[in-house]
Amino acid sequence: MEECKIINLYNLEETIAKEFLEKYTYPWEVLDGIGAYIVELGKSLPKEEYNQIGENVWIHKSAKVYNSAYIGENCIIGEGAEIRHCSFIRKNAIIGKNAVVGNSTELKNTILFNNSQVPHYNYVGDSILGYKAHMGAGSIISNLKSDKTLITIKNGKEKIETGIRKIGAMLGDNVEVGCGSVLNPGTIIGKNTNIYPLSSVRGVIPKNSIYKNKNEIVNKK
């Protein structure tokens, strides 16, 4: 599944986690190590640029964090990022440069690349969102199957048994997810793809495409 590889989904120059991600082939392989990597990386961040607040939390001095936001352990918030009113960052999150975490949005065990946005009523868990990826209002990522079984990544007749119980979605660079959509566990969306509002998405969606529904995925012209 070449289209699911990290190198084909993301421009690694657009994240502080570049060296970490380069060690892996597929994005779901990194999920178990995000928290430990944040602790390691945080200790090396320049003190003249970052404030350490709480347990293993580093916030760039140029970031804007609203007083009502909650930030749990093991987090790095990058330059110019905006953490808005009542956002809930549970733990293990890297928020990239100029990224936005919005009102009533919840994050957990997630990497947001630079300039990515989850600005309005979103849930993002066990996921990676690429450069300039954007989730519309009320769109959520489901990271656990209803029967609690291990997640399989499926693309037509191809499949990869991950051996992992919780995987959200992997959004490539410049992905746009329409309002009110649900990305089911293990969804992979290729670069520059648009998802129509109110969609229920699963499996691997090709890059440079428009997802209208499960039976209508067209290439961008």
Residue spans for each PLM region:
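Conserved hydrophobic/aromatic pocket- or pore-lining residues that grip, position, or stack substrates
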Residues: 26, 81, 110
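Glycine-rich adenosyl-nucleotide cofactor-binding module
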Residues: 47-60, 95, 99, 112
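Glycine-rich active-site/cofactor-binding loop and its immediate structural neighborhood
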Residues: 59-104
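Short loop/turn microsegments at loop-to-beta-strand junctions
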Residues: 54-55, 60, 72-73, 91, ...
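Glycine-rich hexapeptide-repeat left-handed beta-helix
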Residues: 17-21, 109-114, 119-221
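Terminal amphipathic alpha-helical/low-complexity segments used for targeting or macromolecular assembly
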Residues: 1-56, 192, 198, 207-221
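Glycine-rich beta-solenoid repeat tracts in large extracellular/virion proteins
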Residues: 51, 70-71, 88-89, 106-108, ...
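ABC ATPase A-loop
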Residues: 52, 58, 76, 94, ...
